[in-house]
């Protein structure tokens, strides 16, 4: 009788324990489901010692998920894994799937693979978890192997998983063959074909590969298109410079009674500048944003300001700026960049001072725009002010700003300041070296430019097209013909293609210093068609050195064919004929100009008397 009572007590105790474990498990699942991960972990730590083996196994998936999403220290995740092994719960497929997801969150790809490989039984979730981990780590070909294995064992992936693979394929810049393989997976599964998410991912992928035909085919086949689908098409077309199509799609989207969102508007705006519609298209999109209540968005307002400036309507951009309730550093940067593009350095400095008064600190983007304005204005007084502001804001370690300062000082006439900035840079990239070479070249210091060029190569930097052009320009300014010839003939050593701009600079150098025959030979042997600039510089060299022979006539003929509507070419040709005594030919050139209604462009000068900028054209009269 006593043994019967004892048995009943054991059964009751186990039933009570099982009920408590069930209640705890349900409570933990509820907390994790509602994303209260911190509370779930606290409850687990409080109750862990009262749990039996069965109860522990039941709550493990919830606790592991909470650990992963709460981003607890990795040590807790490792402890949970050890407890799984100790309790024999690692044989449970659900627990193993949770461990894979947790290790993926902690970016422990080797642990992910180990758990997956040691699983006795795998399901769809197992494969989805490890493939998502591969997508997260950029392991495209590993993911492809797993997706093949998944199909081999009869597991069908969800559309979200294939969408992740497509996004990875796009990000990794894979071949179109791989892209079409994933597309084939979609075509063989009707459920996937109905997925808007998956179709949108396909559209985005094909547009990133610049395959418009395939993208439009997928887009047209979609039975349901949402805002994201249309936005993917619009942004892809604009990114691939198919601006007209991007704008047409934007209008078609509205005809389908779909409301473009903030991302759609930001995607279509760059097309406005490229299509040369002026500010009319920007106004159309701006009006749409007002009608649908998007106009208050700060990032969108900043984008509208930038586009108005690029379309030449700075005044309207300023109205937007002044009427904005909240003006953050992005808006200030947009407004300053707008004035910088128009070359209004005075207004740029006024805005900078106003910005400081309102207590807003300039960031690197703002300062780069200001440096750009000063570079274009070539005003040294403003350049020094900007440099002080950069020092004050603590951005001198910013390599982009340092490079911009070198260029700014060089163009503003202070080589010593450019040199000082260059040697104070804690880190120098290829642009830094190229900027300094260019600075020496602008001031006619060819030997110093060559020393910097040699130092750049000795420092392990590869010569790119920008550095190559900088050293050729420096030799051109300093008259170092032999050195330039040596460098140009060694272009193949730098594993860099010689561009049209490089040829133009080199031919100009040869022509300026009387090597007309060499210049002409280089021109006719170029691997690409010579530009009008090359023919023009050659013709000027012929005039300077009195070489109006057969070569001079050929060059003049090529120049006229290359740029028949450029009045400067006719003026140069008329001048050459006059100086050679061929007045009849000079008069004929002037008559052709009159018939074509081509007028000579006036020269333009800018001076800075007493810190006031004054502009003069060739036909203007100056009191100075």
From Swiss-Prot:
The keyword Nucleotidyltransferase does not apply. Its main location: mitochondrion. Residues 534-610 are annotated as: Type E motif. One of its GO terms (molecular function) is RNA binding. Transmembrane segments: none annotated. GO terms for biological process: RNA modification. PPR repeats lie at residues 56-91, 92-122, 123-157, 158-192, 195-225, 226-260, 261-296, 297-327, 328-362, 363-397, 398-428, 429-463, 464-498, 499-529. Residues 1-15 form a transit peptide. It is found in: Mitochondrion. Keywords: Mitochondrion, Repeat, Transit peptide. InterPro entries: E_motif, Pentatricopeptide_rpt, PPR_At4g14850-like_plant, TPR-like_helical_dom_sf. GO terms for cellular component: mitochondrion. PANTHER family: PENTACOTRIPEPTIDE-REPEAT REGION OF PRORP DOMAIN-CONTAINING PROTEIN, PENTATRICOPEPTIDE REPEAT-CONTAINING PROTEIN. Belongs to the PPR family. PCMP-E subfamily. This is Pentatricopeptide repeat-containing protein At4g31070, mitochondrial. It comes from Arabidopsis thaliana. The gene is PCMP-E7.
């Amino acid at each position: 009788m006593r043994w019967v009572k004892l048995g009943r007590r054991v059964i009751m105790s186990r039933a009570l324990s099982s009920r408590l474990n069930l209640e705890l498990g349900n409570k933990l699942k509820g907390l994790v489901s509602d994303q209260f991960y911190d509370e779930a972990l606290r409850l687990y730590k409080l109750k862990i010692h009262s749990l039996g083996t069965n109860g522990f196994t039941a709550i493990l998936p919830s606790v592991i998920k909470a650990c992963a999403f709460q981003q607890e220290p990795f040590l807790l995740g490792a402890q949970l894994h050890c407890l799984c092994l100790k309790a024999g719960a690692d044989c449970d497929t659900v627990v193993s799937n949770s461990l894979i997801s947790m290790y993926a969150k902690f970016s422990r790809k080797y642990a992910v693979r180990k758990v997956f490989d040691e699983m006795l039984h795998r399901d769809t979730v197992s494969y989805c978890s490890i493939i998502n981990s591969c997508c997260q780590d950029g392991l495209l070909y590993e993911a492809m192997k797993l997706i093949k294995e998944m199909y081999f064992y009869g597991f069908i992936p969800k559309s979200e998983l294939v969408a992740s693979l497509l996004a990875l394929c796009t990000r990794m810049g894979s071949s179109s063959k791989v892209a079409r393989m994933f597309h084939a997976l979609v075509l063989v599964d009707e459920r996937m074909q109905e997925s808007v998410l998956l179709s949108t991912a396909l559209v985005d992928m094909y547009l990133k590969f610049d395959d418009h035909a395939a993208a439009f085919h997928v887009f047209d086949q979609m039975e349901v298109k949402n805002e994201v689908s249309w936005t993917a098409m619009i942004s892809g077309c604009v990114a691939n410079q198919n601006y007209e199509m991007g704008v047409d799609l934007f209008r078609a989207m509205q005809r389908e009674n779909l409301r473009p969102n903030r991302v759609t508007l930001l995607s279509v705006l760059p097309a406005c500048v490229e299509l040369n519609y002026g500010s009319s298209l920007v106004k159309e999109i701006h009006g749409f944003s007002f009608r649908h209540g998007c106009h208050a968005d700060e990032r969108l307002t900043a984008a509208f300001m930038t586009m108005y400036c690029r379309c030449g309507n700075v005044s309207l951009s300023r109205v937007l700026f002044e009427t904005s309730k909240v003006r953050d550093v992005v808006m200030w940067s947009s407004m300053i960049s707008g004035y910088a593009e128009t070359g209004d350095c005075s207004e740029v400095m006024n805005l900078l001072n106003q910005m400081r008064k309102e207590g807003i600190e300039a960031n690197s983007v703002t300062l780069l725009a200001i440096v750009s304005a000063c570079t274009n204005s070539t005003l040294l007084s403003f350049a020094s002010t900007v440099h002080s502001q950069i020092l004050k804001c603590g951005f001198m370690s910013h390599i982009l700003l340092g490079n911009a300062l070198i260029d700014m000082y060089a163009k503003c006439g202070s080589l010593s300041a450019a040199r000082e900035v260059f040697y104070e840079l804690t880190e120098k990239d290829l642009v830094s070296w190229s900027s300094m070479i260019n600075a020496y070249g602008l001031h006619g210091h060819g030997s110093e430019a060559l020393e910097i060029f040699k130092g750049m190569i000795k420092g392990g930097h590869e010569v790119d097209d920008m550095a190559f052009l900088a050293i050729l320009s420096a030799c051109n300014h300093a008259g170092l013909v032999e050195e330039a010839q040596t460098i140009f003939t060694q272009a193949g050593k730098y594993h860099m293609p010689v561009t049209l701009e490089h040829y133009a600079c080199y031919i100009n150098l040869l022509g300026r210093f009387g090597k007309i025959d060499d210049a002409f030979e280089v021109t006719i042997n170029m691997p690409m068609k010579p530009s009008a600039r090359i023919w023009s510089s050659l013709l000027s060299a012929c005039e300077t050195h009195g070489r109006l022979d057969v070569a001079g006539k050929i060059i003049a003929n090529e120049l006229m064919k290359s740029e028949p509507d450029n009045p400067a070419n006719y003026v140069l040709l008329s001048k050459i004929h006059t100086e050679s005594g061929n007045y009849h030919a000079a008069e004929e050139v002037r008559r052709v100009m009159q018939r074509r209604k081509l007028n000579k462009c006036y020269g333009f000068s800018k001076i800075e008397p007493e810190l006031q900028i004054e502009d003069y054209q060739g036909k203007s009269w100056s009191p100075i």
